[in-house]
């Protein structure tokens, strides 16, 4: 979905969704770059700014997107281990911050008292900036990512989602984060300096042999590479690194695979490609209202099939 921060900024007030909450792209979580969505939308005309703040109330206090009144927030475990729900004025998806006091992309942090009197910090996981968070809120049955898991993350971008995956797997787990873009890779490297369970790899995910010596066997492959040959890229990496019956979680953007076909047709084709690559699809979920024409497909890798 094309989004022009300047032009839509003014609309923030009237549409709420775009400027304020779906402004999770711009307001709620700083969108596709808080600076670009919130910043430019806000700076260009007071109405954009008001849209941010007001949508902010709907989406939670201001552009940062979090819960007001930390004392009243109750943290409950989500059915996916390592993921939590913060219940306050509204319910928010959160992960326990592996590096307390540090935010990665200006996300809201919530501090609560644990039973032993110490403070525990959680980070709000914005579904408008993370396909995995959108999938969890959409009701995925199994994400295979849990405390202690080893994850190969293809298409890590600047590390926004990767940082939350690192929180979920915790200090006993490991995230190998592969990103092709050097610009995004710089942000990824900076994030990994603090999160020591993230191993950043700035390389093309098609060229498995270039990082073969860095990656061990993993429990799950997550892919968000938005390339026409995405299924093949996942298959190459699964063959090299994924254990038998390991999990495969793929985020599919229909327009990146085939911009002329209907999204449902593209998704069905991708499922068929996965089956041909020894991946047994288990569930498929569209990501509305967070992303248009996106879906997540979850499967199990049957190495000896």
UniProtKB/Swiss-Prot annotation:
GO CC annotation terms, alphabetical: box C/D methylation guide snoRNP complex; mitotic spindle; nucleolus; nucleus; small-subunit processome
GO terms under biological process: box C/D sno(s)RNA 3'-end processing; rRNA methylation; snoRNA guided rRNA 2'-O-methylation; transcription by RNA polymerase I
Alphabetical list of SMART domains matching this protein: Fibrillarin
Start and end residues of each stretch annotated as Disordered: 1-70
Compositionally biased region (Gly residues): 7-69
Keyword tRNA-binding tagged: no
Record-linked SUPFAM superfamilies: S-adenosyl-L-methionine-dependent methyltransferases
GO MF annotation: an example: RNA binding
Subcellular location per the Swiss-Prot or TrEMBL entry: Nucleus, Nucleolus
InterPro entries, sorted: Fibrillarin, Fibrillarin_CS, SAM-dependent_MTases_sf
Binding site for S-adenosyl-L-methionine: 160-161, 179-180, 204-205, 224-227
Purpose of the protein: S-adenosyl-L-methionine-dependent methyltransferase that has the ability to methylate both RNAs and proteins. Involved in pre-rRNA processing by catalyzing the site-specific 2'-hydroxyl methylation of ribose moieties in pre-ribosomal RNA. Site specificity is provided by a guide RNA that base pairs with the substrate. Methylation occurs at a characteristic distance from the sequence involved in base pairing with the guide RNA.
Family assignment from sequence similarity: Belongs to the methyltransferase superfamily. Fibrillarin family.
HAMAP family: RNA_methyltransf_FlpA
Subunit structure: Component of box C/D small nucleolar ribonucleoprotein (snoRNP) particles.
Protein name, as recorded: rRNA 2'-O-methyltransferase fibrillarin
Lineage of the organism: Eukaryota, Fungi, Dikarya, Ascomycota, Taphrinomycotina
Protein's gene: fib1
